[in-house]
């Protein structure tokens, strides 16, 4: 490696050095400080003999006497099946005290989006054990389904619940020698989290045994912002290897994408780039797409990469650039709701603004159950009507409502307390979720179930529940 002692400027997480040869974009750099410390960096820009380098460990201790060595290689991730059960820092180095990683291969972390022509359409169900997701906003293999949350809401608890409970149920009609649900892995990437949050994550992974099938990447709040731009790419490179080389169905959970975007803004400001909306880089949409579009399935490969990116909306504003741009790229969203959280509903998922655009392709007979779509549609309609009636009650009082309206109000209350509110430790199968759905729908008269096929009503409707509701209304 050719060595230079030509550092001319230090600006935030960046250093600038003069060179007399062409230097490649994203090339890895070693920086040796005057006291002998070695730091790693990456080339951000190279033009007219001046190179901008982002330093992973921060620029503390670096001055104009530092030595800079260019490797001629881009940043690579050591990948192997033995990564399962390991905990790494945000740049892919082990921090769990375990043995050194013996890689099967080293892969560049700047992967490409899956070729649209080679994509296989996502259509198999992933069971998260969370009724609000499985029953109402179903996740399918190869989908990218973000969770929109707010500051102080329990999105981390929801992420951990999904990480330890998520499975790919075996298809009912699968051949006996096929085990499509056996190879499932979770890659958990945390960016900009506090030490307290990191401890909570690790305690939960170890307590529940979920770590055995997981790879955990931890970038802490006091780690350099530059490392946060690397972490999700390390995560996705590992996921792609396990999915497309080792035939795993991989669920990638990234939290918090807001911290990632703040790191982009910080680096952009240090480079004196022209800012876009609210100071974020104008290329943030493209940058996010390079991450989200790495989810999917490839024809001829058994494995899949499914993404659940989690982001906190500043000021609970879903028009903020981060959730706004994320919504354009991904295939739906799950909303964590502040009002439901204040009522003690766990997890506080508001199903009305939530959406899974690929749900219809991953449910039904042979995937979940024949009545899944009808039950979901009817519960959406009934809950929405109950919500509208709550607004009316605030004006005219409940006494002014008809018996029919009171049944919808009761449905909305029980939908939140019995269907949505299951706690963070309860793992519901899809059958349990749908059975609870029928318990609630049976509060309503049969002629109100206009979104459910008559044959399904005859098969699943509980006459005794309708009778109980009538008695309560009479009292």
UniProtKB/Swiss-Prot annotation:
Pfam families: ATP-synt_ab (PF00006), ATP-synt_ab_N (PF02874), ATP-synt_VA_C (PF22919)
Gene3D superfamilies: 3.40.50.12240
Molecular-function annotations in GO: ATP binding; proton-transporting ATP synthase activity, rotational mechanism
Xref: SUPFAM superfamilies: C-terminal domain of alpha and beta subunits of F1 ATP synthase, P-loop containing nucleoside triphosphate hydrolases
A GO-annotated cellular component: proton-transporting two-sector ATPase complex, catalytic domain
Keywords: ATP synthesis, Cell membrane, Hydrogen ion transport, Ion transport, Membrane, Transport
Membrane topology of this protein: Peripheral membrane protein
Single Gene Ontology BP annotation: proton motive force-driven plasma membrane ATP synthesis
Source organism, top-level taxon: Archaea
Primary location recorded for the protein, binned into one broad class: membrane
PROSITE patterns for this protein: ATPASE_ALPHA_BETA
Subcellular location(s) per record: Cell membrane
UniProt cross-references to InterPro entries, sorted A to Z: ATP-synt_VA_C (IPR055190), ATPase_a/bsu_AS (IPR020003), ATPase_A1-cplx_bsu (IPR005724), ATPase_F1/V1/A1_a/bsu_N (IPR004100), ATPase_F1/V1/A1_a/bsu_nucl-bd (IPR000194), P-loop_NTPase (IPR027417), V-ATPase_su_B/beta (IPR022879)
UniProt record similarity statement: Belongs to the ATPase alpha/beta chains family.
Oligomer and partners: Has multiple subunits with at least A(3), B(3), C, D, E, F, H, I and proteolipid K(x).
UniProt function note: Component of the A-type ATP synthase that produces ATP from ADP in the presence of a proton gradient across the membrane. The B chain is a regulatory subunit.
Entry protein name: A-type ATP synthase subunit B
Protein species of origin: Haloquadratum walsbyi (strain DSM 16790 / HBSQ001)
Gene: atpB
